[in-house]
Every structure is written in structure tokens, then in C-alpha cells.
Amino acid sequence: TFTASTSTDFSTQVNALVDSGVKVVFIPFYAEEASTFLTQAKGKFADDVYFFGADGLDGILGKVEQDVTIANNVLMLTPFAADSTEENVQSFVKAYEAAYGATPDQFAADAYDAVYVIKAAVEKAGSTSGAALAAVMPELEVTGVTGTMTWDADGNTNKNASAILYFDGVGSVFGN
């Protein structure tokens, strides 16, 4: 079982994965635990092994600043890429950097978009009632810094994601 108190020693998992000869390792953790796993894994896997995770890995470079190559071959699926050339993304990134002195991650971008989603829902519903907002969600299409979002009748979000590949301390949109 994975808990905060057991997230400091991944040697058993690392060794088992290395011995199995895998080419892709799924790491479903947040950046803090992932940095521990990747630090313990460094140099043990072949150079062509990739570590795949989702947006919880955002911020991984800040967790491995002592050696950014620890994050080499980390592939993260996320709705936000700060290096996107989209005008609205670049405006958001510049404003965020000016205000906070740091590049925004997907958590900041999702929070930013959430405010505009709520605004659009309130305007469409003409109300702040939770039931009224939920009722109009399937009618909304909101374009934010994390992309264009729609919602189905069950409230599930539909939104594209980008894959970010880290190498030598740089995260770039994979495939570009």
C-alpha cells in the first residue's frame, strides 16, 4: 500500500522494474514522490526507458534541481504547456511571471481557467445555485489557457492534453 510514510524507499519497485526489462514505467504520483522514485532509479534503467505520468508530475524539475537529469525521459500528460505559442497562454504566462516571479504550472492554469468556467456557468444560468450551474454545464464551451473545454451530461470534462517530455532540465511539448 502506498502512503506518505511509505513513499521514501522505492528500491524494491525500481529493481523489479529494471529486472523485467520494461521500456515504459507508469508513475502515478505527484512530483514530490516521483522525484524520490526517479532519484532512486537514476542510472539503473536503460537510456531508452520512459517514465510516464499525468499532470501531478508538474513541478518535477523544481523537485530535482540538484540534478535535473534525474527527470530525463519523463513524459507527462497535461492540459497546460507554458511554452505554448497560443496568444492567450503567453499572455497568462507573462502576467503570472510578472506577479509571482515564476512560470505557472498546470495547477495555476487550471485554477485560472476554473474561475472563467464558473463565470460562464453563472452567466448562462443567470444564477449561482449549484443545481442551476450543473444544469448548464453541458451547454458550455469555454476556451482557456488549458484549452477548449466542454462537459457531457454527467459533468465529465472533455479537453485535449499535451505530452511534455523532460530532458536536460527542459520540458518540451512531445512531438514538436
Where on the chain are the PLM-derived regions?
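Extracytosolic ligand-binding ectodomains
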Residues: 1-176
